[in-house]
Amino acid sequence: MEKKLKMYTASFCPKCRQFHAWFPNEFEYVSVDNWDSEKIESERITALPMVELPSGKKMYAGAMSKKRLEELLNEYR
């Protein structure tokens, strides 16, 4: 079965070093098989691409490699 991830954009506040608003975006569900961090990174404007892991934890995903992403997914099974 193809693994899919929910994508978000998040505004990052450098002052308090926290992510604030979370919005599902145009990559709402992205297949791990078609993961393209460069495309995701280049399409962000001021918001950061984030991914929600099966555990519910959200992480920055822009520079994440496909291999690292698969490791994280397997870790949370």
Regions found by a protein language model. Name each.
Residues 1-26:
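Local sequence-structure signature of Cys/Sec-based thiol-disulfide redox active-site neighborhoods
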Residues 14-15, 35, 67:
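Short alpha-helical
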Residues 17, 29-30, 74:
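Long, low-complexity, intrinsically disordered polar/charged segments
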Residues 20-23, 45, 65-67:
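Short, glycine/charged-enriched secondary-structure capping and boundary segments
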